[in-house]
Design a protein with these regions (language model features):
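Outer-membrane beta-barrel pore domains
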Residues: 212, 221, 228-383
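Surface-exposed strand-loop-strand hairpins of Gram-negative outer-membrane beta-barrel proteins
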Residues: 5-33
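Outer membrane beta-barrel
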Residues: 4, 26-164, 221-225, 295-298, ...
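Aromatic- and glycine-enriched pocket-lining scaffold segments that form the walls
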Residues: 122-224, 232
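Extracytoplasmic loops and strand-loop junctions of Gram-negative outer membrane beta-barrel proteins
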Residues: 18-23, 113-119, 197-205, 239-242, ...
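Outer-membrane beta-barrel and related beta-rich outer-membrane complex signature
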Residues: 13, 65, 102-106, 158-169, ...
Length: 383
């Protein structure tokens, strides 16, 4: 169970229908409070077969578009040992791909910071395969491991909508199945706009597949005692001409990640992603995007101190009148405490964001942002 307090200067949160970069707050300089309850059930009828369900409940003193209760993961995993050095694993259902270098704890939590990087904030919001993951792993005699995986998936056709309409954000949202997230009230989404077919209440990242065609992901990992290297490629193969209460997007991106334990206490990790997203028959939306972060983390006694530098951007490549360009960078400092024999943990974070983004609203106004700050506190109880 998590209790989160936040104070920020970015305006009304995007989850409240605004253009604020952060997940909490209906206006700037107003404290907000949120509660998260994450529950996981695992059942293992055989040593090689496991069923998993991850359910999330959340509440806030702000008006937010997310459901109070929802299923985040529901999957079955089968493992088969070919021999002493080789193993095959099959995952079926909806699940997080193990691409993130920072979201490594249970419930896709981060032990480093309260808010996720811009890249993993977006992954938590808009990308979670519903399909089959086939993973092959080879263990070398020296203990190092090399794995490769392929993942055909469905139900992620709207991936890219939040990036194009809203832009990058910072938070800890893990969108549940069939949940609907707010999008800004843009001129292009109004009844007289070119994309009036978008559902009025927002966008649904995960649910019924819109075009019936699978997307796919490819990834590889190399793991040693102190080093982990990840490479991932994702293409949702969306039919950009389809409108079914929601527009289908064709979103493709790559991720490269590294985690290096310089010492037992000091870790350096980084991820970089680059991709593109298109929607609609020409002249539709066409953007390219990137996000990258570098983080250093030091553990001492029962504490962890982490510093993260994050940079992101979107390049609007289409000829439409709406504005999708943006550029930003942030600096995050977080201190976390977790007692070895305590069920409680506590964290505090400050995030400074310098960004450039302009959006044309259906009211006729133009909204731009520059600098903003987020202060966060977290109290966590595990039982």
């Amino acid at each position: 169970m998590n209790v989160l307090g936040n104070y920020q200067s970015s305006g009304a949160s995007w989850l409240s229908g605004g253009l604020g970069r952060f997940a909490y707050g209906e206006e700037s300089y107003r404290p907000s409070l949120a509660f998260e309850l994450n529950a996981e059930y695992r059942y293992r009828p055989l040593s090689s077969l496991e069923f998993k369900a991850y359910v999330q409940a959340q509440e806030s003193n702000n008006s937010r578009s997310v459901s109070q209760v929802g299923i985040v993961e529901l999957a079955a995993r089968y493992s088969y040992d070919i021999n002493f050095n080789q193993q095959v694993r099959v995952n079926v259902g909806q699940f997080f791909l193990p691409t993130s270098m920072e979201n490594i704890d249970q419930f896709w939590e981060s032990p480093y910071t309260l808010s996720f990087s811009s890249l993993n904030s977006w992954i938590g919001e808009e990308f979670r395969p519903i399909g089959l993951d086939l993973n092959y792993r080879h263990s070398f005699d020296d203990g190092n491991r090399l794995s490769a995986a392929v993942t055909p998936f469905w139900g992620n056709d709207s991936m890219g909508a939040l990036l194009a309409y809203r832009g990058w954000s910072y938070g800890r949202q893990r969108t549940a199945y069939n949940d609907v997230l707010s999008v800004p009230k843009l001129m292009s989404l109004s009844d007289s706009g070119p994309f009036a077919g978008q559902r009025d209440d927002g966008t649904k990242p995960f649910g019924h597949d819109l075009d019936g065609k699978p997307g796919y992901a490819l990834r590889a990992n190399y793991l040693t005692e102190r080093l982990s290297l990840n490479l991932t490629w994702v293409d949702n193969m969306g039919d950009t001409t389809l409108i079914d209460g929601e527009y289908a997007w064709r979103t493709k991106f790559s991720i490269a990640g590294v985690s290096w334990f310089v010492t037992d206490s000091f870790e350096v990790l980084a991820e970089a992603s680059s991709g593109s997203s298109t929607m609609g028959a020409a002249p539709g939306v066409d953007i390219s995007f990137y996000s990258a972060y570098l983080m250093a983390s030091y553990r001492f006694s029962e504490y962890r101190l982490s510093a993260r530098y994050d940079q992101f951007g979107i390049d609007d490549r289409d000829a439409m009148d709406q504005e999708n360009n943006e550029l930003g960078r942030s600096y995050t400092l977080a201190l976390m405490w977790a007692g070895e024999e305590s069920q409680f943990s506590v964290g505090a974070e400050i995030l400074y964001l310098d960004s450039k983004r302009t959006r044309f609203l259906d009211s006729g106004d133009t909204e731009s942002d520059t600098e903003s700050v987020s202060l966060g506190l977290l109290v966590q109880y595990q039982f």
